[in-house]
């Protein structure tokens, strides 16, 4: 990480001008955010479907397996998709840094929609035996590969497009879309379950009903891909492309352009580790609340599948709608204080939440889920604003792809599988709570080494504002403003520019 620099003006230091500042008015921000959020909605819509159909799909895809392995075999579908995510990040991250964020986001959206719909067309184990489960895993791997670039690209895109002073607010809409997508998936499963069982009998979901939610990805995917084709490229990426001789962090040169992923890992190992720790805490809580909760409520609490789906929807919707307000709060007080609050809330609330949940009443379950949602919401609201700010523009997509996907694949996506396995082995009802608390404690340590990024331009980028008057204000106060560090901005190298003019 770069050392703290003095604000004292240095001779020949580049000066920020009004033309350098990116002015992105709200009328340009809104469609860009909308086109990005739809991808996260689609991704988590699939998680909602798969999570709430896990028990049903056990009967469809695991015939012939020992009973104690059937549920774990379907839950392994979660894990296998996440194990592939780092590969998607390693391939799509550098590609996004090279060809642009918008192009990669278009491709990931198309892959995700097609693979989700194809799951709904798979033959069952009754038709082709174990090959049904193999094909399911293959399609989950395609999903994992695409989402390996999707979230890293989406957070990078939103962070680079959002004004510096409101990055937390606009970034929170990305994860609002995620959890609304999950709630939508849960709602579709609940409605489909009720309709099919009511009109076609108790086995209707296993016979054909499970396919319907996956096939709804076809119209949703068409809309999402269309919206992705209409989003512009980010100003930060375009500025980085326009300035091939840019000088950023001279004394801590970013070697990504020369060394690729090896350079990102070698030079940015500290923000990578910080990102991995924070993402692990965020996603163990997030996936426990979403992907694992349907299984826990059915298998451990004894709720009917439709009730297990329905009871989490209001919690997810309310939490989702509050995320922009948490993001706005982080713009005022900073990302680190909000993250610290999330860590403390996790350590205090998680065990009582699972103890209350195991009393078994619907009221108790709602209270317990609300308690789990508090730290989860505090964590996820900051992901799109805090995590991309750890890395400079030239390697932001790659850095996000590595840190986010490694952490999610090892600690987030495996949460349902690992917690269910530990629960079966120990019989301890609070195992999920202890698992979540462990990773939050690690995140608390990582926060000690994290640099505050609220209100500041992204590393390797010029400031981004909403109005011309803000740009004028920043230029006027650039020497006094503690949030402006000219050494991290992509000014042209005067020597190289002069040499190019001489050779022209």
Curated annotation (Swiss-Prot):
Characterize the regulation of its activity: Uptake is activated by osmotic stress. Inhibited by CCCP.
Subcellular location, record wording: Cell membrane
Q: Which GO terms describe its biological process?
A: amino acid transport
Where is it predominantly found? membrane
InterPro entries with a match to the protein in the record: H+-coupled_symporters (IPR051084), MFS_dom (IPR020846), MFS_sugar_transport-like (IPR005828), MFS_trans_sf (IPR036259), Sugar_transporter_CS (IPR005829)
Q: Name one GO cellular component term.
A: plasma membrane
Q: Where are the transmembrane segments?
A: 41-61, 71-91, 118-138, 169-189, 207-227, 272-292, 309-329, 337-357, 362-382, 399-419, 430-450
GO molecular-function terms, A-Z: symporter activity
Listed A to Z, the keywords are: Amino-acid transport, Cell membrane, Membrane, Stress response, Symport, Transmembrane, Transmembrane helix, Transport
What switches on expression, per the entry, is described as: Induced upon hyperosmotic conditions, resulting in an increase of its transport activity.
Give the way it sits in the membrane: Multi-pass membrane protein
Disordered: annotated span: 477-504
Return the similarity comment. Belongs to the major facilitator superfamily.
Q: What does this protein do?
A: Involved in the uptake of osmoprotectants. Can transport ectoine and proline. Protons are probably the coupling ions.
Q: What is this protein called?
A: Ectoine/proline transporter ProP
Which species does the entry assign this protein to? Corynebacterium glutamicum (strain ATCC 13032 / DSM 20300 / JCM 1318 / BCRC 11384 / CCUG 27702 / LMG 3730 / NBRC 12168 / NCIMB 10025 / NRRL B-2784 / 534)
* Upper classification of the organism: Bacteria, Bacillati, Actinomycetota, Actinomycetes, Mycobacteriales
